[in-house]
Amino acid sequence: MQLVLAAKYIGAAIATIGLTGAGIGIAIVFAALINGTSRNPSLRNTLFPFAILGFALSEATGLFCLMISFLLLYGV
């Protein structure tokens, strides 16, 4: 029983590593938005929707990792 519990904790910890990648991805998306806007301010209205889409996709991968972690901890 203790081995199964330890495996759950290790699996949940490994699953949360994906949250770090999501945070880095979001930072890269908004850094690119700031860089593009500073180079050409007239493209702000064109670049912003793409940045929000990139943010949403990066955040979704992080939420999937968090969901898997919770399933490992509290699931069957």
UniProtKB/Swiss-Prot annotation:
UniProt entry tagged with the keyword Ion transport: yes
Superkingdom, natural source: Eukaryota
Family matches, as CDD domains: ATP-synt_Fo_c_ATP5G3
Subcellular compartments: Mitochondrion inner membrane
Annotated positions of the N-formylmethionine modification: 1
TM annotation in the entry: 14-34, 52-72
InterPro entries the UniProt entry points to: ATP_synth_F0_csu, ATP_synth_F0_csu_DDCD_BS, ATP_synth_F0_csu_sf, ATPase_proteolipid_c-like_dom, F/V-ATP_Csub_sf
Keywords assigned by UniProt, alphabetized: ATP synthesis, CF(0), Formylation, Hydrogen ion transport, Ion transport, Lipid-binding, Membrane, Mitochondrion, Mitochondrion inner membrane, Transmembrane, Transmembrane helix, Transport
Statement: the UniProt record of this protein carries the keyword Membrane: yes
Primary location group: mitochondrion
Membrane-related topology note: Multi-pass membrane protein
The family this protein is said to belong to: Belongs to the ATPase C chain family.
Name of protein: ATP synthase subunit 9, mitochondrial
